[in-house]
């Protein structure tokens, strides 16, 4: 039997403009059924606009939005099999918890006893089975957040859109909810599209992350791929902490930076092509100055609980961030070592679109 690989949601060449301001530029996105996806990017990059376009609250200026293979650009929001959990929860303050969850079902004229069963089940899913009769003003922020999720899940959507649903919670509750949401998604097996500007949250929760900036998706991939192989300076900087150092690709598997040559794992660039080299702070080991592949001078350090964050400078005045379990002496030189596969070489100003364009040109030749 053929496996259905059609994406549940597909966006092709979607743009959105408000007057002169283009807030989405040629968005292409495929979401498979049953996976946890995250849109990650800074404030104002267009994450919410993508969610609203999928939900049917905003019309795309151009391009197509598909649900299960059908174009849904003109389908009203209430007829889409998609529900949204909003950042501010948007609960009805004059209704109790159960009434809030029941609201959408009543609107769809679902029979009363079915409503009761489904509401109870949805409340149990988010561990609020006993709080149905409480007023919204009588529950905590974290519980309100769960009501908002229950209210969306009770509609049995195929896709759940979550717009920064954890941003109002304190750090501890936020971590707990990350686990719970991930667990819920896996148990229900529906597609989640989650929006955040918190890279740690995105890395912890997602099957796949789309990193956005200024209305564009710069890179999509698994958390490990995006962390280990950032496509450009922006992604490297946005996902985790990085040392990004200017360099030159001498030939395949050989790169130069800070005036020295290093073996690396990258290939396929022009000889002597100008590049940027990414080295993660946790991939650098400190050794005696005369044994290092590079020598840097320690400027300052902070104790971060399970490691020391050390700031140092090389002779070209590049700043180096190093994570070490041992402290270093400020003002003193230290040696840094790293493995060839810890060096990640990036082309300058690389984006997936630019890469794809190059590939197409290559295929046409
Ligand atoms: N109705 C509107 N009219 C004009 N501009 C809008 C409108 N809605 C959004 N924008 C603009 O579109 C851009 C993208 O907004 P969007 O809300 O999608 O960003 P975001 O990535 O979700 O940001 P945040 O993380 O702050 O919520 C912003 O510059 C915003 O000001």
From Swiss-Prot:
Signal peptide: none annotated. It is a peripheral membrane protein. Pfam families: ABC_tran (PF00005), TOBE_2 (PF08402). GO terms for molecular function: ABC-type putrescine transporter activity; ATP binding; ATP hydrolysis activity. Its main location: membrane. GO terms for cellular component: ATP-binding cassette (ABC) transporter complex. Residues 9-239 form the ABC transporter domain. ATP binds at residues 41-48. Keywords: ATP-binding, Cell membrane, Membrane, Nucleotide-binding, Translocase, Transport. Its EC number is 7.6.2.11. It is found in: Cell membrane. Part of the ABC transporter complex PotABCD involved in spermidine/putrescine import. Responsible for energy coupling to the transport system. The complex is composed of two ATP-binding proteins (PotA), two transmembrane proteins (PotB and PotC) and a solute-binding protein (PotD). NCBIfam families: potA. Belongs to the ABC transporter superfamily. Spermidine/putrescine importer (TC 3.A.1.11.1) family. This is Spermidine/putrescine import ATP-binding protein PotA. It comes from Lactiplantibacillus plantarum (strain ATCC BAA-793 / NCIMB 8826 / WCFS1) (Lactobacillus plantarum).
């Amino acid at each position: 039997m053929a496996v259905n690989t059609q994406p549940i949601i597909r966006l092709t060449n979607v743009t959105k403009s408000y007057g002169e301001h283009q807030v989405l530029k040629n968005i292409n996105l495929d979401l498979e059924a049953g996976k946890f996806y995250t849109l990650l990017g800074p404030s104002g990059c267009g994450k919410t606009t993508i969610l609203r376009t999928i939900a049917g609250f905003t019309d795309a200026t151009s391009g197509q939005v598909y649900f299960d293979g059908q174009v849904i650009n003109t389908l009203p929001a209430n007829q889409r099999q998609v529900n949204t959990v909003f950042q501010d929860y948007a609960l009805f303050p004059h209704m109790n918890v159960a009434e809030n969850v029941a609201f959408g079902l009543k609107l769809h004229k679902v029979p009363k006893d079915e409503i009761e069963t489904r509401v109870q089940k949805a409340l149990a899913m988010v561990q609020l089975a006993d709080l149905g009769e409480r007023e919204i003003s009588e529950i905590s922020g974290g519980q309100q957040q769960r009501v908002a999720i229950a209210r969306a899940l009770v509609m049995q959507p195929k896709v759940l859109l979550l717009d920064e649903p954890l941003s109002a919670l304190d750090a501890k509750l936020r971590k707990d909810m990350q686990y719970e949401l991930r667990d819920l998604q896996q148990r229900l097996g529906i597609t989640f599209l989650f929006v955040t500007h918190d890279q740690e949250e995105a890395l912890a929760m997602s099957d796949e992350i789309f990193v956005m900036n200024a209305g564009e998706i710069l890179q999509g991939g698994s958390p490990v791929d995006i962390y280990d192989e950032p496509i450009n300076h922006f992604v490297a900087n946005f996902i985790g902490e990085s040392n990004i150092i200017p360099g030159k690709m001498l030939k395949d598997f050989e790169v130069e930076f800070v005036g020295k040559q290093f073996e690396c794992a990258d290939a396929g660039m022009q000889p002597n092509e100008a590049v940027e080299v990414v080295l993660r702070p946790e991939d650098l080991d400190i050794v005696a100055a005369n044994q290092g592949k590079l020598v840097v001078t320690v400027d300052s350090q902070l104790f971060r609980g399970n490691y020391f964050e050390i700031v140092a400078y090389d002779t070209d005045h590049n700043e180096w961030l190093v994570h070490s379990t041992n402290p270093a002496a400020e003002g003193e030189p230290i040696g840094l070592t790293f493995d060839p596969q810890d060096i990640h070489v990036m082309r300058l100003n690389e984006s997936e679109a630019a890469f794809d364009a190059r590939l197409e040109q290559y295929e046409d030749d």
